Amino acid sequence: PEKQQKKVVSPSDINAEQQNKKVIIPERPGRTKQVSSASVPKTNTMADITQQTSTIPIKASTSIKEEKSFEQLAQLASSVVLIAVHDMDGDIIGTGSGIMIGKNGFILTNNHVASGGRFYSVRIEDDEEVYTTTEVIKNNSITDLAVIRINRVLNPIPIYDGKKKLVRGQKVVAIGSPLGLFNSVSDGIISGFRNINDVDMIQFTAPISHGSSGGAVLNMYGEVIGISTAGIDSGQNINLAIGYENIRM
């Protein structure tokens, strides 16, 4: 028999419920073969930052930055991954996206993607191997962020340094795996800035869907300005991303 879906709540659920609007959560697809795994170790909070995991790459340059073309930005999909969340029987109970934030295997995603998992399998573009892990390095249910780790050298995406203020109307590109469609790329603009439950969020129009959670929202310089976290079904292209300020905390 097919397993009952498990509802995952993102930080924006409370705000959305107040507006009687449905917030997108990751799909809970199918089944996969049973895989033996150890129990997931106790997770840390985002405040428990160790010296090893706190070095998120910030793009620093003394020269004038140049905007990238959409084609160049699409190539950054190689640093965005597809995450499948498995239960103790090896069944897939959810899917989402994640971004590489460190060369030593660190992947940032939404906490609502990683929560409830016994282990995780990660797919990387142009790599036929599927990487499994039980390592949740840190997580925070308030900011809806989590970091998992795989045993592979990665090519991280730089995080926006915040030196120039983001503005409405600014072009953005979203990369993720909506409905499991691996590393889809879409474009749009920043349509607003929201503070939901004391968490800074970016409202944007680039289309996302179930499975996009944890994916990258980039500026035109190829820097991560946010992490896709939710969208409202009843509104056209009303999507939310966790702001870069929370990523750097």
Report residues per predicted region:
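N-terminal activation segment of mature serine protease catalytic domains
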Residues: 6-7, 11, 17-100, 106-110, ...
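C-terminal cap/linker of serine protease catalytic domains
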Residues: 56-60, 65-73, 155-156, 178, ...
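Hydrophobic beta-strand signal
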Residues: 82, 102, 108, 173, ...
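Conserved active-site neighborhood of the chymotrypsin/trypsin-like protease fold
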Residues: 87-93, 102-176, 180-183, 198-201
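Residues located in well-ordered beta-strands
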Residues: 97-99, 133-135, 184-189, 216
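Catalytic nucleophile loop of clan PA
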Residues: 99, 207-228
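Short beta->alpha transition motifs characteristic of CBS
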Residues: 102, 110-115, 176, 186, ...
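Short, compositionally biased
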Residues: 185-197, 242-243
